[in-house]
């Protein structure tokens, strides 16, 4: 059993390290940087323990493998040391009109002429499900926008 946060509040960032497009990116995931995320991760472990120790699953489980019998600060350390993400990386160039937005409602990048973005990076928040369906919608909408703009 594996529990995880579907809507983490922590936010990472990706930065350019130079002007050359081949320069490596600086990726700062900032997992668990928001205090609510650690609380939610602890709740995930507790829920997995309850389910795993339930009467329905007792015939199929011998013991908890990880994190074992950890509690308190030791459990928090385990969570911090073993945190992973299973989400597709999204929301790095969100659509909107606030100061953190990168593209407008027509997928145009603010301040850069003739550049649009049409992928999962424009989503303002991570979806609770797989990202494929929203990406299909974004692509379909991009096609409609381009056809209208170019009178096709």
Question: Predicted segment positions?
Answer:
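FAD-dependent oxidoreductase catalytic-site/capping-region signature
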Residues: 1-134, 142-152
């Amino acid at each position: 059993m594996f529990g995880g946060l579907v809507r983490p509040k922590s936010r990472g960032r990706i930065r350019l390290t130079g002007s050359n497009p081949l320069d490596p990116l600086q990726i700062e995931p900032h997992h668990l940087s928001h205090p609510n995320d650690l609380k939610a991760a602890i709740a995930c472990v507790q829920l997995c323990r309850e389910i795993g120790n339930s009467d329905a699953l007792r015939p199929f489980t011998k013991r908890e493998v990880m994190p074992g019998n950890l509690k308190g600060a030791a459990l928090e350390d385990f969570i911090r040391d073993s945190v992973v993400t299973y989400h597709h990386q999204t929301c790095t160039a969100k659509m909107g009109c606030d100061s953190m937005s990168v593209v407008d409602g027509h997928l145009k990048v603010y301040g850069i002429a003739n550049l649009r973005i049409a992928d999962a990076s424009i989503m303002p928040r991570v979806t609770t499900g797989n990202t494929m369906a929203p990406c299909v919608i974004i692509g379909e909408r991009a096609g409609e926008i381009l056809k209208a703009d170019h009178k096709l």
